[in-house]
Amino acid sequence: MDTSGFLDLDINSGTTTPNIRNSVTTSNDIMSSIFDTIPTKEKKVDAAVESIFGTEAANSPLISSSIPPIPIEASTSTQQQQQQQQQQEEIIPSQPISVTKENTVTTTTTTTATTAVPTTTTTPTSTLINSEPIVVNPLEVNINTKVDDSDSDQDEQIKKENVVHEIFTPIVSIINNNNNNNNNEIDNNNNGNSNENTTTTTTNKDMNNSFSMGVTTASKDEHIISTTTVGTIEQEIHEKQEEPLISPLQSEFNKIFFSTIPLEKKPLEILKMNAFTGALKYSPLRGIAWKLFLGGLDINRVDKWERDITQQRKRYEKLKEEHCFDPRNSNSTYDPLSQNDDSPWNKFFKNLDTQKIIKIDLERTHPDNDFFSNPVIREMMATILFVYSKTNGIISYRQGMHELLAPIIYLYNQEYSSYKKLDENSSSTLVDFIYNIKYLEHDTFAIFERLMKFTSDWYAPAPTQQTNNSNNSNNTNNNNTTTSPSSSSSSSSSSTTTAAATTVSSSTSTSSSSSTITSSSSSTVSPPPPSSSSSPSPPPPPPLGSNSPTVASSSSSSVQDNEEEELSSKCNDVVLKCKYIHSILLKQKDFELYQHLDSLDIEPQIYLLRWIRLLFGREFHFDDVLNIWDALFAYGENLILIDYFCISMLTYIREHLLKSDSIYALKRIYKYPPVEDVYMLIKKALEIKDSNCSIAGMVKTAQPPTTLSSSGSRQIPNNNNNNNNNNNNNNNNNNNNNNSNNNINNNNNNSNNNITTPSTQANTLPFPETSTFESTTSSFQPYSSQLSSANTTPIDPLSNKTTPLISSTSNVSNTPNITSTSTLLSSSSSSSSSTTTPLQSHTPILTHNNNNSHFSPSPSSSSSSLNNSSHVSIPVKSNVKDIFANSKESDLFSLFSTATTPINNNTSSLSISNPTISIGQARTLNKHKSMTLPSSPLISQDSEALKQLKNTQIEFGNQLKEVLPFLEKGKNFLLGNEDELSKSEIDDFIKALEKVKQIQEILSNNNINNNNENKL
């Protein structure tokens, strides 16, 4: 060969197409440089190491052996290579990719050699990535790398291709360029089965022949370096139609009130169930639920809610403008010194006093909660309480009302502030209208006013002395009023406040020949009437001392007196509720605890007043109070669950109470222990309520006997003529229809001349039985209506013991009984002289007269013996302490010690059975307002034993009086050294000191009473 070309290979990282420049040389030079020398074993190892670790391996010539020259003819078509490149690019996953191509695919043809020779390894530089040692033919190839930038046209037509060889098989081949070999080579490259290749290509200008040398890599990993892309891959965006944004409150509201799917229960029942289980505290509809429970909104008129709420808000705005008037901001001029009631300045100054009291209470409202320290919230609460005080003129504002307002405004502010309309472009909905924070104050006032409809009577103030005097004067006028035979008159005891706390009412029906005295012992603790939660409680029974509808009113009565009487009756409601909880419910559910508290003389109103008026706001944590209110409001029926929740609270601490005395019991009740889960108390209260069904059912099914007699009535023997009884029987029975408040039933028995009057049912409220989820509410008769026959001894519903009653038969009665009344009700008629004892000298007396056959107050007392008289004098007081107020201590111990002599019925005398009674039993009778009174006189005042006992009591009292100062000093010393002594020792000393004081006071009072008796 004359000429041959040197292969110049451009191995640059930046380009993939080699630039080849041909140079003229001899064939001997080419053959000698490639095939002359065969390396030895040592040289092969050195060459391999040098090829791996050396940097000049690409430029150093390889030692090769001489082989016969082989004609080389290998070329590729540029057009086919471009088509193959396009097919390779189409294999890439179809994703929207923006690519900036900077490099092109380098493809080479595979040259195949027919000779197999020993191999050695070398590594080309700057062409392979992550490759292992290269297996090459041990031929020394001298490659001169020269680059000529001038041959650009020739460079574009020649491209490299990657050569795929089998691993560990060195092949050096020179083949002719044909289409079949090119297609196979490209397919192998596309399948990823090729490794990195080092390609050398040379062309012969004269013969237009080209050859290539391929070197395979011994690599197990597959690498594709055919293309290099620079750019960003854009992810496909799938546009989804988003649903309109709805707040959780809106979603919950629509789910309950506007559900397209029929619900298993009604919306109100769902809310009530959530309230009892505790799920309501997590609901955003708690405020609406309270308003529904209290009757602020009608659940059956959801479509009218927007109109009703608008009216409530407008009403509050009107009241606020009317009562929150400031004459300083008015354009008109008013006299600030005017005392006229219509004067704006006079109203303004009165309002300032009320507002000052309100603000003082608000400063003490939950001081540990920062929410109530906010000036905006305080101003809002002050305005609400002031507007309510002006709309409720009788009660106005009372301390404790702010405690009821605090949870309401806290809840409403929390819900109104958290609600936010997510989609401002959407139309306004009912939820958007309700939860408008602009009307937070308006809606808070609306629900607070609804709550006060059930609790306002509990805040009625105690009647003043002027009220008592006016009532007494009215009672006097009523007693002196002349009535027809069919009319009725009433009178009260001297103290309205004391009587109101013990009894509900008493009435009498009188005629010219008959008289009736009615009293109800069980009515002292009457339960409230069950009714729907949306209606206010019915009007209370007429107060003591007020005129009944059938009594002729006095000419001096006025509207102001009626308001005072109404206020007095409201004040009694909460006291009666306390007594009902203690004496009825607690006794039924836990008699042991009731008996223990009763023995400690702990009045129920001492602690129950705070529990009831504040709805347990100070006994539990603030969040627990909200949970308790959920259940109270959801149960409805005039918040009757309060009664049973009180019993649940007492039974929760019963073990502490049973082991403690009066001091520790009060401490435990006043400082109620923390409760981990208040729903346990709620569940217990519901169980107590449901367990009353059997008791109430027994009362409901009780049938009245033939002869009317009750534990709350008084049977008094009356020797009237048969003709008079027959004439007045119809008149007395007609009063039952006219007097609806008293329900006086007068049944005159002609055979035995008995006059019996059952307890009034109107004054005794029905016993609650049904639960909230029952469809109808049954009304049950009170305990006082449990009527028994004359032959059966009635059972006292409070003590479950036989109750003594005065009865009269044709024969001598061995068990005449009597129950006391709190007021003396009698007709205005004359009576003959009666006998009394010193015990009865200062008490109202009922005197029985054979001639006139009626009872009247005794004008004076007599010292004659009762056994020698035909009259019976019965002292009537509201409690046992008042009855024995003027008696001596010795009389108390010997009151029932002497047996009585039976009195013949012909002389209108009474025989008292079971005359012996202990002081403990007397205390129990005091609580129950029912006791047995003696018919025998007291021990003679001239007895020597009585004088000695008097002197002993006086001396003992004087000695205790001298000892008390030293005991007080010891108490102060112990309190000053609390660190050295144990708390139990100090408490024991204090208890002993208190008992000594009580004994000294009793002896001192007896000494004063003895002196008063001696003066009389």
Swiss-Prot record:
Residue stretches of biased makeup (Low complexity): 79-88, 467-525, 545-558, 718-755, 766-789, 807-872
Domain of life: Eukaryota
InterPro entries: Rab-GAP-TBC_dom (IPR000195), Rab-GAP_TBC_sf (IPR035969)
Protein's name according to its UniProt entry: TBC1 domain family member 5 homolog B
Biased composition (Pro residues): 526-544
Gene: tbc1d5B
Biased composition (Polar residues): 12-23, 704-717, 790-806
Species assigned in the record: Dictyostelium discoideum
Gene Ontology BP terms: adenylate cyclase-inhibiting G protein-coupled receptor signaling pathway; negative regulation of asexual reproduction; regulation of sorocarp development; response to caffeine; retrograde transport, endosome to Golgi
Key words, A-Z: GTPase activation
